[in-house]
């Protein structure tokens, strides 16, 4: 028996559309990260970018459980002395770029390195219900029906 190793030329990428409305952030991010890496495919090869292209819409309607909506903090540093900054998940979701919550959650579930950066380029997140990828004919994936814990009605 020989271990299967897929070549980059053999990769077939599909387009997946996920509606994030009322979905739990961590559960959504886990599913998206696995789709981006290609771990759902029987032809998964760790060193090849064989994941799908994922489109997430309604990112501003994602749900955080518990007190994370008000208490979870995202930190960054400006580079200056004493330049540590923070924002809560609520400030980001109600701000100009609510899609960054999903991007950051998925980014932290993808391996760091050149392959991880290439896989992150296959993720498109939009705050509203409109997206410019109709020509790719994305296949809708209903994450809420996969597991009852994936969806929260607020």
UniProtKB/Swiss-Prot annotation:
Assembly information from the UniProt record: Part of the 50S ribosomal subunit.
UniProt family annotation: Belongs to the universal ribosomal protein uL13 family.
InterPro entries: Ribosomal_uL13 (IPR005822), Ribosomal_uL13_bac-type (IPR005823), Ribosomal_uL13_sf (IPR036899)
UniProt protein name: Large ribosomal subunit protein uL13
Role: This protein is one of the early assembly proteins of the 50S ribosomal subunit, although it is not seen to bind rRNA by itself. It is important during the early stages of 50S assembly.
GO molecular function terms attached to this record: mRNA binding; structural constituent of ribosome
A Pfam family matched in the record: Ribosomal_L13
Superkingdom to which the source organism belongs: Bacteria
Record keyword Hydrolase present: no
Keywords, ordered alphabetically: Ribonucleoprotein, Ribosomal protein
Lineage: Bacteria, Pseudomonadati, Pseudomonadota, Alphaproteobacteria, Hyphomicrobiales
GO cellular component: cytosolic large ribosomal subunit
Xref: NCBIfam families: rplM_bact (TIGR01066)
Residues covered by region (Disordered): 129-154
GO biological process: negative regulation of translation; translation
């Amino acid at each position: 028996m020989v271990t299967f190793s897929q070549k980059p030329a053999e990769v077939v990428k599909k387009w997946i559309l996920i509606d994030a409305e009322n979905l739990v952030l961590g559960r959504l991010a886990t599913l998206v990260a696995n789709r981006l890496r290609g771990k759902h495919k029987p032809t998964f090869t760790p060193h090849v970018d064989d994941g799908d292209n994922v489109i997430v819409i309604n990112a501003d309607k994602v749900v955080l459980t518990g007190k994370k909506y008000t208490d979870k903090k995202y930190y960054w540093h400006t580079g200056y002395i004493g330049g540590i900054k923070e924002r809560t998940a609520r400030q980001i979701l109600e701000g100009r770029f609510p899609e960054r919550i999903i991007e950051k959650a998925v980014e932290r579930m993808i391996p760091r390195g050149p392959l991880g950066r290439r896989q992150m380029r296959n993720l498109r997140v939009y705050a509203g219900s409109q997206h410019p990828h109709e020509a790719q004919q994305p296949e809708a994936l209903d994450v809420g029906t996969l597991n009852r814990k994936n969806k929260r009605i607020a």
